[in-house]
């Protein structure tokens, strides 16, 4: 009896304090986790099936994302693909172009609706981050991309002389901005992607000398950090037509981290979605590869990976069928490495020549 009375008293006290908190800070200020309307984190596709798989479904909505890597590794391409996917679902996207380097033609080729894409090219880092904060607080924008953190120059640095030292200004700016923005991001459900560059630390003997710009705040606030690297140049003969890139999920708060994905980025076209599909279909056993030949249900469909991609491109219904089967296999728990290295260079080219002869 004493236990029941004690429990009843605690429950009354809990109800009173919860009501008091809601009166003081508004409804929803505190809740039981089981009552939350969004238990499962919704995701945005990156345009690359292998990367979506490595991320546990895609980029999480309502979170801070950091994409970093060397120059020309595909950072902006991945971000633009995410924008295109959001727009396909009827969402509103914004691009804060601090580098003043956005190519509308390339963005359009990737599927971005440039007519409805909100673009800002601010002069200072403070202006850029204030614009981001206002967009996020509006709850009207679904995704904001900042390109890049390195280009968010503090106002004091712009107004000062060229040789002036401004130690830690950008790091303090990022730390303050993220403290303000993060809470609003969670409430609005807006995804904020920061593109970042790499720098070399001086005097490092052990470990990697590489570091990202803007201090450590972004590393802590980001739910997902993607390290993207170019590992191979794709060629047809002597002509270069794209890059093979490897993405390591350096941090992931919503799925297992440290997974690796590889995919092709074609110059002028973006991520090769069909290339990703061929890789995953092969790994899940839907497409069988013997030597250079790809077969489906015992029938040869193409010789070489490039021709397999071309075959799927020419037959969209078959491509959709393969995609559906791949998703079904993955939903059933099929284990894939998500990082098949494309063998689409010399071997395929030689075999294509033999076939023509």
Curated annotation (Swiss-Prot):
GO terms for cellular component: cytosol. Gene3D superfamilies: P-loop containing nucleotide triphosphate hydrolases. Coiled coil: none annotated. One of its GO terms (biological process) is DNA repair. The keyword ATP-binding applies. PROSITE patterns: RECA_1, RECA_2, RECA_3. It comes from the Bacteria. GO terms for molecular function: ATP binding; ATP hydrolysis activity; ATP-dependent DNA damage sensor activity; damaged DNA binding; single-stranded DNA binding. Residues 346-357 have a biased composition (Acidic residues). Pfam families: RecA (PF00154), RecA_C (PF21096). HAMAP family: RecA. Belongs to the RecA family. Can catalyze the hydrolysis of ATP in the presence of single-stranded DNA, the ATP-dependent uptake of single-stranded DNA by duplex DNA, and the ATP-dependent hybridization of homologous single-stranded DNAs. It interacts with LexA causing its activation and leading to its autocatalytic cleavage. This is Protein RecA.
């Amino acid at each position: 009896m004493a236990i029941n009375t004690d429990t009843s008293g605690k429950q009354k006290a809990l109800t009173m304090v919860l009501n008091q908190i809601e009166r003081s800070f508004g409804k929803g200020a505190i809740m039981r986790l089981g009552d939350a309307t969004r238990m499962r984190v919704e995701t945005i596709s990156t345009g690359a099936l292998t990367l979506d798989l490595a991320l546990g479904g895609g980029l999480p909505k309502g979170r801070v994302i950091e994409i970093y890597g060397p120059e020309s590794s595909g950072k902006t391409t991945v971000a633009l693909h995410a924008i295109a996917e959001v727009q396909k679902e009827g969402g509103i996207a914004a691009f804060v172009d601090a580098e003043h380097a956005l190519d509308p033609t390339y963005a359009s080729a990737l599927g971005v609706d440039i007519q409805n894409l909100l673009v800002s090219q601010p002069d200072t880092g403070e202006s850029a981050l204030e614009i981001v904060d206002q967009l996020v607080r509006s709850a009207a924008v679904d995704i904001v991309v900042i390109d890049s953190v390195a280009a968010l120059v503090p106002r004091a640095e712009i107004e000062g002389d060229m040789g002036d030292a401004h130690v830690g200004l950008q790091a303090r700016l990022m730390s303050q901005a993220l403290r303000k923005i993060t809470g609003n991001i969670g409430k609005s459900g807006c995804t904020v992607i920061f593109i970042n560059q790499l720098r070399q630390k001086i005097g490092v003997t052990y470990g990697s000398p590489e570091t990202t710009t803007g201090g450590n705040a972004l590393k802590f606030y980001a739910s997902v950090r993607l390290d993207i690297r170019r590992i191979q140049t794709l060629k047809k003969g002597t002509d270069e037509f794209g890059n093979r890139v490897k993405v390591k999920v350096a941090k992931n708060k919503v799925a297992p981290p440290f997974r690796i994905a590889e995919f092709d980025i074609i110059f002028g076209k973006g991520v090769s979605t069909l290339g990703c599909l061929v890789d995953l279909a092969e790994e899940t056993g839907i497409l069988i590869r013997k030597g250079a030949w790809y077969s489906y249900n015992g029938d040869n469909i193409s010789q070489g990976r490039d021709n397999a991609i071309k075959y799927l491109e020419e037959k969209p219904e078959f491509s959709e069928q393969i995609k559906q089967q791949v998703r079904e296999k993955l939903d059933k728990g099929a284990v894939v490495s998500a990082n098949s290295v494309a063998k689409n260079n010399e071997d395929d080219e030689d075999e294509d020549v033999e076939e023509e002869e």
